């Protein structure tokens, strides 16, 4: 079970997430996000996890191919998460250069908003609740993932519902942001991160 802690805004939080066993550390570059980080801050976050096993992921919902290439070169980010209206074009241009997380937005009723293009299992599909930062899950019981083995469950995952999500859907990974945050300050709660990561790993082992 892979775990991505997304919306990291501080190097200390990245370091603690890596120590807790997070496989991926996500940084958001969307200007309209409360969790948006600058290139300078992202560089510090990448440096904070260099000695561990966590992989830095840049979240790019609105940037051009050229902007993504420039930011990743400046920051040292090695994986990218793509979403937005021109996702197909960006995916075709960047898939040979990066490990890619491909976002499929899901409506509250559990229905995906778009079809999945042809891709191999090297690409990680992330199912996220439309609205992104609402912090609530879509209808997991009504949801059925596409025929693609490597996928993550996102959108409202937290310590209190992770068991249900893994039991119902058996994802290859989970993607969590607000579910491990300290209320009101957009910093991560160390103990919530540790508990959620431990739960994810234990639950995935018990379902094998």
UniProtKB/Swiss-Prot annotation:
Gene3D superfamilies: Aldolase class I. GO terms for biological process: L-tryptophan biosynthetic process. It is an enzyme of class 5 (isomerase). One of its GO terms (molecular function) is phosphoribosylanthranilate isomerase activity. It catalyses: N-(5-phospho-beta-D-ribosyl)anthranilate = 1-(2-carboxyphenylamino)-1-deoxy-D-ribulose 5-phosphate. Pfam families: PRAI (PF00697). InterPro entries: Aldolase_TIM, PRAI_dom, RibuloseP-bd_barrel, TrpF_fam. The keyword Amino-acid biosynthesis applies. Keywords: Amino-acid biosynthesis, Aromatic amino acid biosynthesis, Isomerase, Tryptophan biosynthesis. The keyword Membrane does not apply. Its EC number is 5.3.1.24. Pathway: Amino-acid biosynthesis; L-tryptophan biosynthesis; L-tryptophan from chorismate: step 3/5. NCBIfam families: PRK01222.2-3. Belongs to the TrpF family. This is N-(5'-phosphoribosyl)anthranilate isomerase. It comes from Chlamydia trachomatis serovar D (strain ATCC VR-885 / DSM 19411 / UW-3/Cx).
């Amino acid at each position: 079970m892979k775990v991505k802690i997304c919306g990291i805004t501080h190097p200390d939080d990245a370091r603690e997430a890596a120590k807790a066993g997070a496989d991926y550390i996500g940084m958001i570059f969307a200007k309209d996000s409360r969790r948006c980080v600058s290139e300078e801050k992202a560089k510090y976050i990448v440096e904070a996890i260099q000695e561990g096993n966590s992989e830095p992921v840049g979240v790019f919902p609105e940037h051009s191919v050229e902007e993504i290439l420039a930011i990743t070169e400046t920051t040292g980010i090695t994986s990218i998460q793509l979403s937005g209206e021109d996702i197909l074009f960006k995916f075709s241009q960047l898939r040979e250069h990066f490990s890619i997380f491909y976002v499929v937005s899901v409506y509250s009723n559990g229905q995906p908003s778009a079809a999945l293009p042809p891709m191999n299992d090297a690409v990680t599909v992330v199912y996220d609740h439309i609205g992104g930062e609402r912090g609530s899950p879509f209808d997991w019981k009504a949801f059925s993932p596409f025929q693609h083995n490597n996928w993550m469950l996102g959108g409202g995952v937290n310590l209190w519902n992770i068991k249900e999500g893994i039991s119902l859907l058996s994802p290859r990974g989970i993607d969590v942001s607000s579910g491990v945050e300290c209320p009101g300050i957009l910093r991560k709660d160390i103990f919530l991160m540790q508990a959620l990561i431990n739960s994810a790993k234990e639950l995935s082992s018990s379902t094998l």
